């Protein structure tokens, strides 16, 4: 499995000032993390040459982070359950922390919209995910897993999810479910725009599942 590492430098106003992307064959081991941190260190050094000071590094992870922020308590997607921050950051020259990627996205929403008070953020990416905002702040809950909407049961006894349960939202609302074997997502929408009936039906069914998920969320959390 090949992973894409995206390093983004954010200034204190929340503006992206530089980006670097690299691909690495993924392994949940020390060698992989050292190579990754080498990329980050090089990126930070280039920023320093341009007059910037790097204050720290946030690892945005597809996994549930422990309450103390020191380990991954549930990491099925990356197969890294139990990964500790000191292992992840080995060889890194800067202070660091771990955060669930959806929580990081929600914090960005708050940064750019100071009027945002109560909301559920829904991110329909390859692996759908969410985050909860209450009274203008990210609300992660005692186990740091508030907003894990992708694992609500949408269809009882339905498709098997990577988490081991059946019928999770992820298995019905992931954009991957729109594609047939060998089809790309842009390819799907290209055919959809041409009005092909089977693609229209598939997209309509997907929208129904997404709407059902939103309805379930709103029945629990009264947000607008």
Can you name each region flagged by the protein language model?
Residues 12-13, 67-68, 134-135, 156:
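Short, ordered coil/turn segments that flank beta-strands lining enzyme active or ligand-binding pockets
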């Amino acid at each position: 499995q090949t992973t894409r590492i995206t390093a983004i430098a954010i200034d204190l106003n929340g503006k992206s000032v530089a980006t670097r992307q690299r691909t690495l064959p993924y392994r949940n081991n020390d060698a992989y993390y050292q190579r990754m941190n080498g990329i980050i260190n090089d990126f930070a050094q280039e920023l320093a040459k341009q007059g910037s000071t790097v204050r720290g590094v946030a690892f945005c992870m597809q996994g549930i982070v422990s309450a103390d922020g020191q380990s991954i308590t549930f990491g099925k997607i990356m197969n890294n359950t139990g990964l500790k921050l000191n292992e992840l950051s080995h060889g890194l020259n800067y202070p660091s922390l771990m955060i669930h990627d959806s929580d990081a996205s929600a914090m960005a929403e708050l940064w750019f919209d100071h009027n945002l008070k109560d909301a559920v953020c829904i991110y329909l990416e390859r692996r759908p995910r969410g985050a909860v905002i209450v009274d203008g702040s990210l609300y992660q809950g005692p186990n740091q897993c508030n907003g894990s909407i992708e694992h609500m049961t949408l269809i009882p006894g339905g498709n098997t999810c990577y988490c081991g349960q059946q019928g999770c939202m992820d298995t019905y609302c992931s954009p991957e479910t729109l594609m047939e074997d060998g089809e790309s997502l842009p390819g799907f929408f290209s055919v959809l725009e041409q009005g092909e009936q089977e693609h229209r039906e598939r997209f309509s069914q997907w929208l129904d599942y997404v709407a059902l998920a939103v309805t379930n969320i709103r029945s629990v959390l009264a947000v607008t």
